[in-house]
C-alpha cells in the first residue's frame, strides 16, 4: 500500500508539483507488530482524525481520543467512522488535553503519544512535567525520517523541530537515537554525517569544530555505524561531490543515512526543502521519553502522520 496526499501548495517554479507519496515500507514493517494504543491529544479536527482513521483502517493502531467529544464525534461522522468501540476522554482546551494525553502514556495506558490540533509548545510542555510520568532521564530529541518515491533509502535529519541550539551533549544523544532508529529499521551499519558549511575545520566556524569533536566521540563510543564530519551538504548527499573533492574513500561522504545538524534553523531548512522542493515524505518522532512522541505539524498531511505512527510502532518494538 502506498499513501498519497494531494499537494495543495500554491505553485511556484521551485515547489514540487508531484503528489507526496509516503513509502509503504514503514507501514509494512509496523504491521508485523502488535497494534499500539495511540493517544491523540486534542483530537477533534480534520487531519489528526483522518490520520487516526486511516491508521485504524490499515489495522495499524488502536486510537484513544482526548479532547472535545462533540468535535471528535463530528469529525468521525464526516469520515463515516463509527468510533463507539474506542476510548474517548473529554478534555477542555489545549493545555488540559495535552496534560491528560501525556499522563495516559506516562502511566502505561498509551504506547504512542500523538499531537493533534494544538500548539507545539503547549504539547511539549505537558510531556516535560514530572507529573506526566514520561521523563526517563534522556534528553528529548526530534528526528525526521524522510523518504522519496524515487529512492528506497531514507535520510534522517536531527534535530529540526525541538532543540533550537543543541549542546554537544544533546547532539550526542541525537546521534545515538539516529543509529538506534536505523538499527530498528534493519540497517546494520548506518552512516552518520555531522553538518557544517565545510569539510575542513575552521577556527571561526563553531559547527565545523563541533563536528570534529562529535565524529571522534561517536567513532569511539558507538558501534555498528560510521561517522564523519565536518561535511557540507553537497558532500553528505552527492557521491560525485565527494569524488571531486577527494573524499571518495570517506565511508559517509556522498552516502549518508543521517544528518546531525548544528541548530534547528539548518535542520528545519533542510527538512522543509526535501518536503516542499523535492516532494519527500517526512515521518517525525521525538525520542527520549517513556513512549515515542509524534510532534507533527498541524498542516502535515494524514499520510505523513501515518508514516510517523508506523515509525513509532517499529521503535516501540525494537
Locate the predicted segments by residue.
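Anion-binding alpha/beta catalytic cores of soluble intermediary-metabolism enzymes, centered on
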Residues: 2-252, 257-318
